[in-house]
C-alpha cells in the first residue's frame, strides 16, 4: 500500500534523473460510501487513517469531483465516513511532495465499490475497464499539470546566462569552460 507507493515514487524520481517540477499523478481505484462505481474523484483532502496526518492538495482544475480520500491499511468495507478509501495515496503524496511542488502532485481515483455495490471480485481487467472509462478526464488533468510544470520552470538559457555573467565579470578561457559546464548542469537540475 502506502509504503510501496512511496518507494515507487523514490525509484521513479531517481530514474527520471531527479528532475524537479515534474507532475506526479497517483491514479487508482477507491471505494466510496455514496459515489457511483466508475465515477472519477480528485482528492482535495488526504487523510492517513493510522496516523491522522492530513494533506490538502491544491486544486488545479475546477471540478465538482473533489472528495476526501482516506488511506487505510486494510480494505475498507464499512465506509464510516462519506469519503473515498484507498491504500496508497498518503504514501504517494508524502513522497512526491519531496520531489515537486504541491500543485503538481495530485491523486485521482476511480470508484470501484460502494455501499450499494460492494467489492466482490476485482481483477486487473475490471480495474483497466474502470480507469479506461475515465481516460479523457485523466488526460485533461495530466495536460493541465504539464502546462503548470512548464510555467513553474524558470526560462534559463545557458548562452544567455554565459553572456550576462561574462559581461559582468572577467573569466579566463578555462574558467569560461568550467562555468559553462556548471551552468549546463545547474539548468538540468532545475
Task: Describe the function of each predicted region.
Residues 1-189:
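Glycine-rich phosphate- or other oxyanion-binding loops that anchor nucleotides, phosphorylated ligands
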Amino acid at each position: 500500500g502506502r509504503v510501496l507507493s512511496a518507494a515507487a515514487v523514490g525509484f521513479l524520481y531517481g530514474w527520471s534523473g531527479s528532475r524537479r517540477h515534474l507532475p506526479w499523478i497517483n491514479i487508482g481505484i477507491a471505494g466510496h460510501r455514496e459515489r457511483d462505481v466508475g465515477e472519477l474523484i480528485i482528492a482535495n483532502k488526504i487523510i492517513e487513517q493510522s496516523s491522522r496526518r492530513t494533506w490538502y492538495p491544491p486544486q488545479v482544475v475546477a471540478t465538482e469531483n473533489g472528495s476526501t480520500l482516506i488511506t487505510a491499511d486494510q480494505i475498507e468495507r464499512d465506509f464510516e465516513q462519506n469519503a473515498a478509501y484507498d491504500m496508497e495515496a498518503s504514501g504517494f503524496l508524502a513522497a512526491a511532495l519531496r520531489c515537486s511542488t504541491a500543485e503538481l502532485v495530485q491523486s485521482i481515483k476511480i470508484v470501484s465499490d460502494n455501499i450499494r455495490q460492494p467489492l466482490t471480485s476485482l481483477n486487473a481487467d475490471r480495474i483497466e475497464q474502470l480507469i479506461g472509462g475515465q481516460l479523457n478526464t485523466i488526460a485533461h488533468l495530466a495536460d493541465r499539470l504539464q502546462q503548470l510544470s512548464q510555467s513553474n520552470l524558470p526560462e534559463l538559457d545557458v548562452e544567455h546566462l554565459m553572456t550576462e555573467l561574462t559581461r559582468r565579470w572577467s573569466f579566463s578561457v578555462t574558467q569560461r569552460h568550467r562555468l559553462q559546464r556548471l551552468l549546463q548542469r545547474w539548468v538540468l537540475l532545475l
